[in-house]
Amino acid sequence: MALRLTAKQAAGPLEITKTTGERTMSQIRYLLQLAALAAMLGYALPSSAETIIDEWQNIKAPPPPQLQAVTLDPKTTALIMTDIIKQTCNNEMRPRCVTSIPKIEKLLTAARASGVTVIYTLFPSRSPATFPNPVISDYIPAVAPKGDEPVVTSFADKFMLGDKDTGLQKILKDKGITTVVPVGVVAHNGILFTAVEAAFRGFNVIVPVDGMAGNGPSGYDEQATAHILTDSIVYKVTLTSLDMIKFQ
């Protein structure tokens, strides 16, 4: 705080005038008083002790990502049919999966006709005594495998089973695949983790949003998956829909 002394003041008590610094302090005090008043009226900012769970109902969903039409080269594209079996794709657990079957079947038919590599996945049971290990015959008939189409078994990340390679990477590389299209269940497990891992491994990843199903009818799992897949600077995933995919 600056002091201004006149000749008169030099001979007597000092008179201190308000400077810029003093005015700033007054403004700060005024703002603090306003904040205290706002708190009393219930308009205070959220407490630092609040968590994302406390704020759950007040969080607004981000804008929806844009879907893109894609034309894929059959020679370098693989369609990964992910766990579309009766145990996981039914009206009780995942009604969206059931309603997506006709469109997935249409895409599968077009893929086979164009010579696209089709790969199937299963998952091992964590409790075989109460939930037997799924087998390939559990696939929904409309989208079941044909001939010698390969099958890999894993949990969410279809490239790895624990610390072991599932063979998916080798299948893709041996066939010259550069683009993968995972469809099926579950959106926030098998689709999400396989898509991200494929992107990390250098593959182009195309995910049809109406070809993945989460738990229940709400659509929250699918929305969250779509947001995560497209909101990263580390990996790139293209979102599309089943009828926006062409092979040429």
Model regions and ranges:
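Cleavable N-terminal signal peptides
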Residues: 36-37, 47
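Acidic/histidine-rich, surface-exposed loop or edge segments in extracytoplasmic proteins
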Residues: 80-91
